From Swiss-Prot:
Keywords: Metal-binding, Stress response, Zinc, Zinc-finger. Residues 62-99 are annotated as: Disordered. Zn(2+) 3 binds at C116, C118, H132, C134. This is Zinc finger A20 and AN1 domain-containing stress-associated protein 9. It comes from Oryza sativa subsp. japonica. GO terms for molecular function: DNA binding; zinc ion binding.
Length: 161
């Protein structure tokens, strides 16, 4: 009797493993139920295709901020914004190639040239402001930088009692 109860318990607890499932795409590899019966490579390709095919697009409806009916004045065609004129002039001028010669002695500097704040490129002997008569005002630039970094704080006057 003990053997019969032991036999019934073992039959209930023993589960036969499922046979491996081949990939749905018939690539020869085994698939998984977690990946829709596809192998890892086919599933990765499937996810790529589905995300590319249906990109998420959010359409925002335009709603006016105020419902007031104020008439708008049409722009005059004769007036052209100043920014547009400057853009046209900048587009007409071709960009200058970077200078690879010293502005003082015209010596070729190549990649070893020093850029100055005045806008020029100089060799190792003319890189200092005294050597090339620099037009940039370093003192004023320093004062402006300090003034910008340390704003003036004015305290309120104290009322005497």
């Amino acid at each position: 009797m003990a053997q019969e109860s032991w036999k019934n318990e073992s039959e209930e607890t023993v589960h036969t493993p499922e046979a491996p499932i081949l990939c749905v795409n018939n690539c020869g590899f085994f698939g998984s139920s977690m990946t829709n019966n596809m192998c890892s490579k086919c599933y990765r390709d499937f996810v790529k295709v589905t995300t590319m095919a249906a990109p998420v697009v959010e359409k925002k409806a335009f709603t006016p901020a105020s419902s007031s009916k104020t008439p708008l004045e049409p722009a005059k065609p004769d007036e052209v914004p100043a920014a547009a004129v400057e853009d046209k002039q900048a587009a007409q001028e071709p960009p200058k190639p970077p200078s690879n010669r010293c502005l003082s002695c015209r010596k070729k500097v190549g990649l070893t040239g020093f850029q100055c704040r005045c806008g020029g490129t100089f060799c190792s002997t003319h890189r200092y402001t005294e050597a090339h008569d620099c037009t940039f005002d370093y003192k004023k630039a320093g004062r402006d930088q300090i003034a910008k970094q340390n704003p003036v704080v004015i305290a309120e006057k104290i009322n005497k009692i």
